[in-house]
Amino acid sequence: VYTDSRQWTALDALDILREQLTISNDAAFERVSGGIEFEVFRVSARGRDPFIIKFPGTRWIINDNDRDLDSFQLMDQERRLIGFSHEHGIPAPRVLAYPEAGSFPVLAMEIIDADDLPLLAGELGRMTRRLHLLRPPEISTVAQRGRSPSDVVAQLTVERLKVVEQLSGVGGAVPTESTLREMLGPIDADVRLLHMDLRRGNYLSRDGQITGLIDWSNAMIANPVLELARLVEYGEFSNGFAAGYEITQREAATLSGEAGLACSLYTAAMLAVVFLSEAPDPELAAIKVERVKELLTQFG
């Protein structure tokens, strides 16, 4: 019985998949990765190529960055956005199986051949631009909670800044939610599908070229400046990225303006909370808290 309160394992996931895939009883699996939200295993079974399974450890995600996110909805979103990627030429793994609505959500996917070589210059920028040029899908992303980008980003920024203050003891003047919402107005216009977590663990590559975008949990439908500001805070927005993205003067001006500042604060606060609370790392936490302080000084 798959209740909201139980913890799930790879064996649970395989049991569900047996209804759609032929999986031998002696199938072996090894944990590939796991994060705050999901577990990922490699499965080897007689008579078929190895494949990947991804599933939530528990239904409700509650932490200092996110409150009451439904991992079942996130899994369905992942399936839909992988399908959208395939339809529009964005590399992504092929979905092998996904249970019917109402069942425990486990995603079975092909294994994409990948290596650890660094990306070619501008590759991440080019792939990000390809994504941002697409007409967005008709989907309400879980991260947006059915609200406008400016509304949800403003609220989450203020909430996360309060957590940063509580956990670090570092205070100071914090912009109000209404002030941030006004500054963030541009992210409600000319919206596109944003991945919102384009770091090394969330894309696969081979010979320096991206072969698959994965993990769409943070996806939003908003103006690309929100994602560009996130990439600045991730340390991914290099000259090579900008060249590959072919950033325009207008986009650069928006990114360096008040909308970009508010977007950067949104991500900086999130990262500070991650390293203060969700994945504690005192050294990184100190760096991220200092970055939050630096950004706050730029608000009038």
Which residue stretches match the model-derived regions?
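A generic structural signal for beta-strand entry/edge sites
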Residues: S103-V106, Q209, A269
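Soluble or luminal CAZymes and related metallo-dependent hydrolases
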Residues: S5-D12, G35, Q73-Q77, L120-E123, ...
